[in-house]
């Protein structure tokens, strides 16, 4: 634990976060859009499948992760997705990584190297296909087609389950044994969130709490609704009562029919890859599909009291960004030590207070409440109120009943599935 370490005041770190230009991290993730599949995933998978030089059967996690950690870890993550602050000279640094290095003597080269899953995946392709070190010891990839490709083609190491005691003790139930990675064989969650409904209460004409409200001009007006291209198919199926994980072309067409009905109703302003949050805060959208952390940030930390994020009555899409160790990584022992370090509640809370997404460590709630009370005792009332609001938000600390109303969405594992999916859904958002 790093509770005894000399850490910066959380008010300083987070107030600095408030002043930054808030990029939509999930928007960055989606930025390349579905069209990025043109990287040639199908051919890529076929090429990998023929390369049996690095078969998972030959991977011995005990051997891979059993040595002494090296003195440097290369960590590829998304922009603005970790705790940042500034020193007295104005230089930006990451307190949690500074503390890790003090404790272990291991230097961490943290790079905001990932702008989208498909783009980053494509950059790694030559080294992965050749069985070479990618230069990264930890990468962060979202559950979905690229995560599935990395695992199925044995391009990430299976983890040693004896090397993550903090994960075993503190990880949320939803973070353990996820359907897309049974028994966490290859991954540990970094952060997570939900896709639901963001609303501007100044513009809606009645409660917008279910999907059909977003197709009703009497509630949302005309030309004032945003939809997210990548999440839309799964999200619509969930809200039609369809289980996307077991869905097929018939269900996909049912979802597409609803989307066409919504488009024909004249409510759509734009189908977004990213940037929806700018239009929501600017008053250009009355309602939009939205990622939970984005609206929470603007409402809680930036004073947009007119915004709300609603969990749809029909359910929400649950996405998870996952830490993985690429095959042939130079320092797997160091990588898994750092991955497990982030499952200490104090460390995880430092990240949560900065990024405001769903933490895989539920005990961060108590830590943040303690920080809020400490800030309140020091008369940092505005700051303490924000921390209280963060810790008490049910969408950052969901109960089992809420999680039961979510789905990870459809895993598309074959070229035929991907092609049919795209043929059904792409014309709607691109038409």
Predicted regions located by residue number:
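N-terminal twin-arginine translocation
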Residues: 22-30, 38-60
